[in-house]
Regions:
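Terminal-proximal interaction/regulatory segments of ATP-powered molecular machines
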Residues: 12-76
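Hydrophobic residues on short alpha-helical segments
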Residues: 2-13
């Protein structure tokens, strides 16, 4: 996991409460290109089980929260 992967996850978790949040909103918050996130960052995070795509946007999984030593509120 590189710095962009970590920033993506922390953005979704910390700025958007774990999601769902749209990719364009994430890109703007990260000051990055939507296409870069969709083509480079997101596929890795989805494959690792850290992010799920939904119709409403991207959602951080419980695994993503655990990776940072956090507890996902809806899993309490």
């Amino acid at each position: 996991m590189d710095a962009n992967d970590i920033l993506f996850l922390k953005t979704v978790i910390e700025k958007f409460g774990g999601g769902p949040v749209g990719i364009e909103t994430i890109a703007q918050a990260m000051n990055d290109e939507k296409d870069t996130l969709e083509d480079v960052v997101e596929p890795y995070l989805v494959a690792c089980g850290f992010i799920q795509r939904s119709k409403k946007g991207r959602v951080a999984t419980e695994l993503a929260y655990r990776h940072f030593g956090l507890i996902k509120e809806d899993s309490l």
